[in-house]
Amino acid sequence: MDVLSAVLLALLLIGANAFFVGAEFALISARRDRLEALAEQGKATAVTVIRAGEQLPAMLTGAQLGVTVSSILLGRVGEPAVVKLLQLSFGLSGVPPALLHTLSLAIVVALHVLLGEMVPKNIALAGPERTAMLLVPPYLVYVRLARPFIAVYNNCANAILRLVGVQPKDELDIAVSTAELSEMIAESLSEGLLDHEEHTRLTRALRIRTRLVADVAVPLVNIRAVQVSAVGSGPTIGGVEQALAQTGYSRFPVVDRGGRFIGYLHIKDVLTLGDNPQTVIDLAVVRPLPRVPQSLPLADALSRMRRINSHLALVTADNGSVVGMVALEDVVEDLVGTMRDGTHR
């Protein structure tokens, strides 16, 4: 092979190495949520990258195979080519062969590390989604051609991993833990990227999975209920007005003559019934009062109460006894902070 062809082949191998390194780091670094957003904007290559990421072990094996083969061939072709180039271009034919080969190898290694490794790696890390969308489509063509070799190496690697007790992964885990996210929020506050109100709101949102209904439940002794006027009938207008005047709340649990909860009333349900304090409210107006265990996470309680469209719920102990009450507003306030308005609760 003449010198020019050998040099061009060496540069081509460095380019191939850079291609595989860039594709590998782009696949690892690209965030699925950003790719999904790009896919929703109609970027077909984003969908291609997402699908490639779902076969991550095969993709990485293919990249490593490509890097290895390119590096071996570069060593085989590049070093002799540089030796000949130095001899012809710079008149170094009189230099001892050992020194000339050492110098040529150093030049090839430097070009390989800089252009074939570091530059493509940093380009991929600087813009992983953009780089992945550019490199992955042609990379998949190579993967299809090299699939038999990739499958053999991938299966061997997985077998070795299982032998040492490591479970192979088919997809990159990009999730962060609650603790890591809390640290990120704290750092954002200290750096001025978040104000104190935003920091508090985000912190509350993170801890909702660890907060239970018992943490926000109102004890029975603090509940202002209205009692039915007689068995089989509802409370009176006067009873509801008195409760409203005392608390300013808009919803009141209803109890029977024995003190058992039978539902709750919203103040708007009785506005059309007149202003006679002795008027008895029909039990049909009383809304159902669901029950939630005190050990239920607040996030689940929020979902349950929203699903059944109830603003109040009885809180029960493990034995089923009623120990308190929780309002939907209490759950929301634990998430976003206290809210005050003219119809609090």
Swiss-Prot record:
Gene Ontology CC entries for this record? plasma membrane
Q: Which domain of life is it from?
A: Bacteria
- Topology with regard to the membrane? Multi-pass membrane protein
Entry-linked SMART domains: CBS
Q: InterPro entries given for it?
A: CBS_dom (IPR000644), CBS_dom_sf (IPR046342), CNNM (IPR002550), Ion_transp-like_CBS (IPR044751), UPF0053_domain (IPR051676)
Q: What CDD domains has UniProt attached to this entry?
A: CBS_pair_CorC_HlyC_assoc
Is Transmembrane helix found in the keyword set?
Answer: yes
List where the protein spans the membrane.
Answer: 3-23, 95-115, 312-332
User: Which UniProt keywords are present, listed alphabetically?
Assistant: Cell membrane, Membrane, Repeat, Transmembrane, Transmembrane helix
The subcellular location is: Cell membrane
CBS domain mapped to chain residues: 217-280, 285-342
Which parts of the sequence belong to the CNNM transmembrane domain? 1-198
What protein family is recorded?
A: Belongs to the TerC family.
Question: What protein name does the entry list?
Answer: Uncharacterized protein MT1889
Record organism:
Mycobacterium tuberculosis (strain CDC 1551 / Oshkosh)
